[in-house]
C-alpha cells in the first residue's frame, strides 16, 4: 500500500522543525524534503507541493499565500500554520475540539488552517461559553497571554539562544500594545465574539510553554463560576488532549512549562471566595497544541491515520 506523502514547506523554521521531529519516526507516511539550497525556489517548492498528498505550510503569511498559488494539483491538500487563512471562508479551522462536527470537517477539507498558539487557549475557553449562552458575544472580554520566546519565531529564538540582537530580547516583555495582535480575528470568529476583545500578549525568557487567562466579573455575567466550569467540562468530556481541572484541585501556581513536549491543553476555572470574580485559564505548549502538535493532529485527521 502506498504511503501518503507529506511535504513541510518551511521546515527550517521553529514550527517546521518541531513538526519534522514529530513525524520523523513515522513509518505510515513518507516525508518529502527539499534541497536546502532551493528551499526558496518557487519551482522546486511547486514540484513538492503538487507531489505531496498534504503539504504543511510553516511560512510567513505572504509565502503561505504564494504556496497556495503554486499548488495547482487539485488532489494536493494544504495545512497552513500561518495566520494567512485562519478566517478565510474556504479554509476549515484546525481545532478539532471546537465542536463534535469539527473533526469530520477537517477530514474532508482540502484546506485546513492550523490555529495560533494564543488563540488556541482563548478559543478553548470562550467557545463553549458563548455556545452555551453563558457569555454573550458582545461581552467586553479581556485576554492576557504569557509565552516562552519560541512563540516569537526564529529571530527571537536566536536572540535568546545565540545572543543576537533583537528588540524583544529580555527577561519579560509586553508587546502588541496597539491592541491589534494577529490572533484576534480568529479568536473572535471561533470564540463566538462580536465585540473585539482587549488582548495583551507577553513573552518571557523561558523557551516554550504558555498560559492564557481571561478575568471576569461574574456579577456582570449573571452566572456562577461553577456554571462556567460545568459548560467547559461538558464540552470537552471524552477529549484526548483537552482536560478541564476540577475546581477544588486547581494548582495555586500555573507553570506555563508543565505541558512542554505534549499536545495537551489544560483548562482551569478559578473563583474568588465571595463568588464575585473568576479567572479562566488555559495552559499549553506553544510549540505543541499551539503549533506543531496541533498540526500533526490535523494531519492525521486529513490522512485518515491513527492519532499518534
From Swiss-Prot:
Subcellular location, principal: cytoplasm
Alphabetized GO MF terms: N-acetyl-gamma-glutamyl-phosphate reductase activity; NAD binding
Active site per UniProt: 117
Keyword Lipid biosynthesis: no
One GO location term (cellular component): cytoplasm
Keywords on record: Amino-acid biosynthesis, Arginine biosynthesis, Cytoplasm, NADP, Oxidoreductase
Pathway this chain belongs to: Amino-acid biosynthesis; L-arginine biosynthesis; N(2)-acetyl-L-ornithine from L-glutamate: step 3/4
Segments passing through the bilayer: none
Catalytic activity: N-acetyl-L-glutamate 5-semialdehyde + phosphate + NADP(+) = N-acetyl-L-glutamyl 5-phosphate + NADPH + H(+)
Record's keyword annotation contains Nucleotide-binding: no
Biological processes per GO annotation: L-arginine biosynthetic process
PROSITE patterns (UniProt xref): ARGC
Pfam families in alphabetical order: Semialdhyde_dhC_1
Enzyme class, broadest EC rank: oxidoreductase
EC number: 1.2.1.38
Compartmental location: Cytoplasm
Protein family according to the UniProt entry: Belongs to the NAGSA dehydrogenase family. Type 2 subfamily.
Protein role: Catalyzes the NADPH-dependent reduction of N-acetyl-5-glutamyl phosphate to yield N-acetyl-L-glutamate 5-semialdehyde.
Protein name: N-acetyl-gamma-glutamyl-phosphate reductase
Gene: argC
Amino acid at each position: 500500500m502506498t504511503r501518503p506523502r507529506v511535504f513541510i514547506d518551511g521546515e527550517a523554521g521553529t514550527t517546521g522543525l518541531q513538526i519534522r521531529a514529530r513525524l520523523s519516526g513515522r513509518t505510515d507516511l513518507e516525508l518529502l524534503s527539499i534541497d536546502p539550497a532551493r528551499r526558496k525556489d518557487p519551482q522546486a517548492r511547486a514540484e513538492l507541493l503538487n507531489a505531496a498528498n498534504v503539504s504543511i505550510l510553516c511560512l510567513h503569511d505572504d509565502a503561505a499565500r504564494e504556496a497556495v498559488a503554486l499548488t495547482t494539483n487539485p488532489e494536493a491538500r494544504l495545512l497552513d500554520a500561518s495566520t494567512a487563512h485562519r478566517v478565510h471562508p474556504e479554509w476549515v479551522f484546525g481545532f478539532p475540539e471546537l465542536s463534535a462536527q469539527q473533526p469530520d470537517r477537517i477530514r474532508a477539507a482540502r484546506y485546513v488552517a492550523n490555529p495560533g498558539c494564543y488563540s488556541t487557549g482563548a478559543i478553548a475557553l470562550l467557545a463553549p461559553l458563548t455556545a452555551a449562552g453563558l457569555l454573550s458575544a458582545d461581552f467586553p472580554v479581556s485576554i492576557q497571554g504569557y509565552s516562552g520566546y519560541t512563540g516569537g519565531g526564529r529571530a527571537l529564538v536566536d536572540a535568546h539562544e545565540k545572543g543576537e540582537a533583537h528588540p524583544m530580547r529580555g527577561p519579560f516583555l509586553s508587546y502588541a500594545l496597539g491592541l491589534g495582535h494577529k490572533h484576534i480575528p480568529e479568536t473572535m470568529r471561533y470564540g463566538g465574539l462580536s465585540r473585539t476583545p482587549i488582548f495583551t500578549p507577553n513573552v518571557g525568557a523561558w523557551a516554550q510553554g504558555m498560559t492564557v487567562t481571561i478575568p471576569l466579573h461574574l456579577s456582570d455575567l449573571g452566572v456562577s463560576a461553577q456554571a462556567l466550569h460545568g459548560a467547559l467540562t461538558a464540552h470537552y468530556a471524552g477529549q484526548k488532549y483537552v482536560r478541564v481541572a476540577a475546581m477544588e484541585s486547581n494548582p495555586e501556581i500555573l507553570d506555563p512549562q508543565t505541558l512542554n513536549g505534549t499536545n495537551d491543553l489544560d483548562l482551569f476555572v478559578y473563583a474568588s471566595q465571595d463568588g464575585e470574580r473568576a479567572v479562566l485559564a488555559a495552559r499549553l505548549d506553544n510549540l505543541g497544541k499551539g503549533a506543531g502538535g496541533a498540526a500533526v493532529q490535523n494531519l492525521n485527521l486529513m490522512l485518515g491515520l491513527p492519532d499518534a
